[in-house]
Amino acid sequence: MSEKSREEEKLSFKEQILRDLEKVKGYDEVLKEDEAVVRTPANEPSAEELMADSLSTVEEIMRKAPTVPTHPSQGVPASPADEIQRETPGVPSHPSQDVPSSPAEESGSRPGPGPVRPKKLEREYNETPTRVAVSYTTAEKKAEQAGPETPTPATETVDIIRDTSRRSRREGAKPAKPKKEKKSHVKAFVISFLVFLALLSAGGYFGYQYVLDSLLPIDANSKKYVTVGIPEGSNVQEIGTTLEKAGLVKHGLIFSFYAKYKNYTDLKAGYYNLQKSMSTEDLLKELQKGGTDEPQEPVLATLTIPEGYTLDQIAQTVGQLQGDFKESLTAEAFLAKVQDETFISQAVAKYPTLLESLPVKDSGARYRLEGYLFPATYSIKESTTIESLIDEMLAAMDKNLSPYYSTIKSKNLTVNELLTIASLVEKEGAKTEDRKLIAGVFYNRLNRDMPLQSNIAILYAQGKLGQNISLAEDVAIDTNIDSPYNVYKNVGLMPGPVDSPSLDAIESSINQTKSDNLYFVADVTEGKVYYANNQEDHDRNVAEHVNSKLN
């Protein structure tokens, strides 16, 4: 074969290699798009490097390949493909055919260079070769066609860079699998952890809201009472369980935790009337007060009667009560009941000592029971009626006067007379000291058959007692009014009290301060009372401490 033929064969082989490398490069670009997740390890050469190295290796082999002597029998020199085939390890010759040795090898008479071993590639990426048929006619094939012998057909094989690159890519991707799996595990862990945090946060929020909701009243609009008994020696947890069963708290355990957190440790045993409108804080405060030994009827409202109130004022106060009572508690019903003679007769029979001197029907008293209803605070229950309420007030007066009944009798006074004097003392003086002195003045005037001359009685007769009266109005009262309560004209006491006196006024009227005073006048602007034992001094006190304030 001529030099030109060899060069052409080399160029043809080189072009084939380049075409194959171009195909590998195109396939590599497709793989890069499809397998973007898989990263080529840092130490694996890229496709471009493989192409460049392979091309340089082929050129070096072509350049350094020695000239093989022509076979004596064929005269066809070995082709470069033969050299590459001999260089590739692990490719066995055809065992089924015995290839005869050349005459030169048998005789050894012809001198010439020994067998030339091609230089091993300096860089191998895969040691497993792939044999494929080439697209051109090799020198061996030409010799086979020219020679008389029919050698065993052989398929010329070369390393296919594309398969090599593909296997290299697959083999290079294998180490990345653990990284991918590890990355997946980390990602799963992070997601699980975030989900856990989200659930924890949501659980904490809803748990906090549940606790707050458990501390609120069961029914904020409920007015009903629930009677609960707390046994002696019950701890906070047991009390919480009892309240939960009674429907007063939503969760007994939360109640006990809250009680400990707020340091409510002094909860007392007993019977309690509690409401569903109470919060946990309200319930704990109520349990600190202590219950009763026996169950009591729930209190729906409280009624406070101030000291010195008249029956008209008491009736108006009762009419302001609101609640789900057994019967309607109105001012009209109250006034009708205190004037009911049947009811009065029953009361006299029930409280004989208190009511034995009660003003008679034709005494001129506006209300026979005026002054007999003790001023205090009363509990209004579901079963409370007008009659039961008045009876409770009479019972309170009887109870407070019981210690003084014998003393009143020893002073030659009736209960009605004492209460009448006390009703005037209640309004004329504000301090206990003054009340005792004023009571002494009244007794001195009574003992001398002098009219009491109290403006309080005149105001009651006019229906103005209890109203805001100015100093000018007080001075200008009608002392000539035709009324049994006109103590300017009438000597002695009125038919009965004009208001409900306080216990202090009652005691001051029983234990009056003795003196020779017959007059008194109060400076309402200063709250000071001036006393005198003669008319001249009294007139001077009036001019100085009352009339001077009118200008």
From Swiss-Prot:
Compartments where found: Cell membrane
Listed transmembrane segments: 188-208
Entry membrane topology: Single-pass membrane protein
EC number assigned by the record: 4.2.2.29
One Pfam family hit: YceG
InterPro entries attached to this UniProt entry: MLTG-like
Segments on the Extracellular face: 209-551
Biased composition (Basic and acidic residues): 159-174
Catalysis: reaction(s): a peptidoglycan chain = a peptidoglycan chain with N-acetyl-1,6-anhydromuramyl-[peptide] at the reducing end + a peptidoglycan chain with N-acetylglucosamine at the non-reducing end
Sites marked Important for catalytic activity: 428
UniProt KW Cell membrane keyword: yes
Annotated keywords: Cell membrane, Cell wall biogenesis/degradation, Lyase, Membrane, Transmembrane, Transmembrane helix
Entry keyword Transmembrane helix: yes
Residues in compartment: Cytoplasmic: 1-187
Effect after changing residue 488 to D: Decreased endolytic transglycosylase activity. Grows slightly slower and forms cells of shorter lengths and greater sphericity. In unencapsulated strains, suppresses the requirement for essential genes that mediate peripheral PG synthesis
Ranges in coiled-coil conformation: none
GO molecular function term, any single one: lytic endotransglycosylase activity
Domains as described in the record: The cytoplasmic N-terminal region is not required for endolytic transglycosylase activity under normal culture conditions.
Family: Belongs to the transglycosylase MltG family.
Miscellaneous remark of the record: Peptidoglycan cleavage activity could not be detected in vitro under a variety of assay conditions, but a gene deletion can be complemented with E.coli mltG, leading to the conclusion that this gene is the functional homolog of the E.coli endolytic transglycosylase.
Job of this protein: Functions as a peptidoglycan terminase that cleaves nascent peptidoglycan strands endolytically to terminate their elongation. Involved in peripheral peptidoglycan (PG) synthesis.
Name of the protein: Endolytic murein transglycosylase
Gene: mltG
